[in-house]
Amino acid sequence: MVPKVGINGFGRIGRVVLRNALETGAVEVVALNDPFIEPHYAEYMFKYDSTHGRFKGDIKVDGKDLVIDGKRIKFYQERDPANIPWKDSGAEYIVESTGVFTTTEKASAHFKGGAKKVIISAPSADAPMYVMGVNEDTYAGANVISNASCTTNCLAPLAKTLNDKFTIVEGLMTAIHAYTASQKTVDGPSSKDWRGGRAAAQNLIPSSTGAAKAVGKVIPELAGKVTGMSVRVPTVNVSLVDFTVRFAKDVTYDEVKAAIKEASEGPLKGILAYTEDDIVSTDILTDPHSSTFDAKAGIALNKNFVKVMSWYDNEYGYSRRVVDLIVYVSKKDAGQ
């Protein structure tokens, strides 16, 4: 049975999760909630997308609900997650994509309205984090879980592959990251992050990220061995992980490429991709993989010290994994 899904927060990730749900048919979205968007505006925002293009299906408003390709999706406008009547629509698996309710306690408010499980589409301070292809098999039935971050979803499959094969001693990551909705179009106030308040489309902006350290949470043997930072760049979508790593074993760059290619065609197929083409960022737009290893972009200094680079659509690939995680946990919950 296809899991019935509700989405709280109809922003970039909320809308792209819905696109992925419709594209795959793997889950059925039956309800949406966003207190800041009324149904006609939600229709417009979903239909027209500057990054991923116009929605090719049929969408209209009927009363207070959306009807997409003939299927009704309940639309709520509650500010408090505890007041969202998920049970009325049959939504059991809730995608928490507001970026606000990212702790177990805050996300648990959804249960008051009839939710069965909450999947936070962001890193969480205390909810178990899962990265598909890396540690989903450790899922133990927690009712609030996290899909980690888009950058962790790019780095972790790569790090797992390299660590399993060659043993990582230590690694540093730089995420060359497209700007996001949290940034400013022109210089503006940002008291906690002064650089982050500068104009997104005009600047390269060094920033912090917990994505690399989070790899240690999903791959415990790498805890304390990997860290990183990010640079926000003036592009609207698609990012690039630059991972410099020291191995315990002697290895050539060709062996690194071969290991990643093997993983991309085997256990990580559909999650980790491999390319030897001379691609640039727009070539990854709307790509559903978590991570696309760029074989030509990496380099080795010696037999232990290597730089690898991997692309990711930080919206689309990440949102596809949200859908995949829901499918996975729903099967586990059903005892399959």
Swiss-Prot record:
Transmembrane stretches, start-end: none
Positions bearing the site annotation: Activates thiol group during catalysis: H177
A GO CC annotation given for this chain: cytosol
Pfam families: Gp_dh_C, Gp_dh_N
Biochemical pathway: Carbohydrate degradation; glycolysis; pyruvate from D-glyceraldehyde 3-phosphate: step 1/5
EC numbers on record: 1.2.1.12
Gene3D superfamilies referenced in this protein's UniProt entry, alphabetically: Dihydrodipicolinate Reductase, domain 2, NAD(P)-binding Rossmann-like Domain
UniProt keyword Glycoprotein present: no
Superkingdom of the organism of origin: Eukaryota
Active site: C150 (nucleophile)
Residue numbers binding D-glyceraldehyde 3-phosphate: S149, C150, T151, T180, T209, G210, R232
A GO BP annotation: glucose metabolic process
Catalyzed chemical reaction(s): D-glyceraldehyde 3-phosphate + phosphate + NAD(+) = (2R)-3-phospho-glyceroyl phosphate + NADH + H(+)
Annotated keywords: Cytoplasm, Glycolysis, NAD, Oxidoreductase
Database matches in InterPro entries: GlycerAld/Erythrose_P_DH (IPR020831), GlycerAld_3-P_DH_AS (IPR020830), GlycerAld_3-P_DH_cat (IPR020829), GlycerAld_3-P_DH_NAD(P)-bd (IPR020828), Glyceraldehyde-3-P_DH_1 (IPR006424), NAD(P)-bd_dom_sf (IPR036291)
Main location: cytoplasm
A Gene Ontology molecular function term of the record: glyceraldehyde-3-phosphate dehydrogenase (NAD+) (phosphorylating) activity
Subunit record text: Homotetramer.
NCBIfam families: GAPDH-I (TIGR01534)
Additional free-text comment from the UniProt record: This protein is a koningic acid (antibiotic)-resistant GAPDH isozyme. It is present under antibiotic production.
Family indicated by similarity: Belongs to the glyceraldehyde-3-phosphate dehydrogenase family.
PANTHER family: GLYCERALDEHYDE 3-PHOSPHATE DEHYDROGENASE (PTHR10836), GLYCERALDEHYDE-3-PHOSPHATE DEHYDROGENASE-RELATED (PTHR10836:SF76)
Name of protein: Glyceraldehyde-3-phosphate dehydrogenase 1
Gene, per the UniProt record: gpd1
